[in-house]
């Protein structure tokens, strides 16, 4: 997982010179914060733990793990906005609106660093390399967000689910003998929540993918056997 962070397009050499050892000692964000004596907090989240924020001027950095970002309206209706993984960030300068709030739910064990946004802005002003790093990071995150919107915009629920499985395999998968195994267990309910469907539909589609041997389940984890064939299922919908 360290490799995923250090090889992202948004990282520059000054923040990733140490590529060995403990993950937190070579994380580009923490390297910069520690070297410049910048205060930050780290939260450890278990699966299904949730961070709520409705008036915040903080930046949250996912050091390791995955989070679902959801907008919760006053009538408790939820809208999934994004699926974030290791190296991604979320948060805003400030939000004051009684009509909604945001929540971030962990779908596996997750470590999140938290820092005041004013501190980030000050660091960008005082350090040109960090400013470039941060701008490139925002561009990278915008591209990922656009890709996620494309996934959940499919008219076909099957296409949404197949696209999501491919995304999870790419961002949170490990190569095994018979395909790519997701690094964590994920319930049908969570999959349905992410793609804006229901558990019954997701269960039916997964059963079909299992029957056609495009995926399998091992130790409660999904294995994508052939990303190419699974992507064909999207094109044929």
From Swiss-Prot:
Keywords: Chloroplast, DNA-binding, Plastid, Transcription, Transcription regulation. Pfam families: cNMP_binding, HTH_Crp_2. Residues 155-228 form the HTH crp-type domain. It is found in: Plastid, Chloroplast. The keyword Chloroplast applies. Its main location: plastid. Coiled coil: none annotated. It comes from the Eukaryota. One of its GO terms (molecular function) is DNA binding. One of its GO terms (cellular component) is chloroplast. Residues 188-207 bind DNA. InterPro entries: cNMP-bd_dom, cNMP-bd_dom_sf, HTH_CRP, RmlC-like_jellyroll, Tscrpt_reg_HTH_Crp-type_CS, WH-like_DNA-bd_sf, WH_DNA-bd_sf. This is Putative HTH-type transcriptional regulator ycf28. The gene is ycf28.
């Amino acid at each position: 997982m360290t490799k995923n962070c250090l090889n992202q397009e948004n990282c520059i050499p000054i923040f990733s010179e140490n590529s060995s050892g403990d993950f937190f000692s070579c994380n580009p964000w923490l390297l910069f914060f520690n070297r410049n004596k910048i205060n930050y907090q780290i939260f450890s989240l278990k699966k299904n733990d949730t961070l709520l924020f409705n008036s915040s001027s903080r930046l949250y950095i996912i050091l390791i793990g995955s989070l679902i970002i959801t907008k919760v309206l006053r009538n408790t209706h939820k809208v999934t906005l994004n699926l974030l993984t290791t190296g991604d960030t979320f948060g805003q300068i400030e939000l004051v609106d009684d009509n909604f709030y945001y929540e971030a739910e962990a779908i596996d064990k997750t470590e999140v660093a938290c820092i005041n946004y004013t501190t980030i802005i000050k660091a960008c002003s005082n350090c040109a390399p960090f400013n470039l790093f941060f701008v490139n990071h925002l561009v990278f995150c915008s591209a990922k967000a656009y890709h996620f919107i494309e996934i959940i915009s499919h008219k076909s629920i099957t296409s949404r689910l197949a696209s999501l499985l491919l995304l999870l395999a790419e961002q949170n998968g490990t190569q095994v003998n018979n395909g790519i195994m997701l690094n964590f267990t994920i319930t049908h309910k969570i999959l349905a929540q992410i793609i804006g469907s229901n558990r019954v539909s997701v269960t039916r589609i997964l059963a079909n993918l299992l029957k056609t041997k495009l995926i399998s389940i091992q130790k409660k984890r999904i294995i994508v056997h052939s990303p190419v064939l699974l992507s064909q299922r999207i094109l044929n919908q």
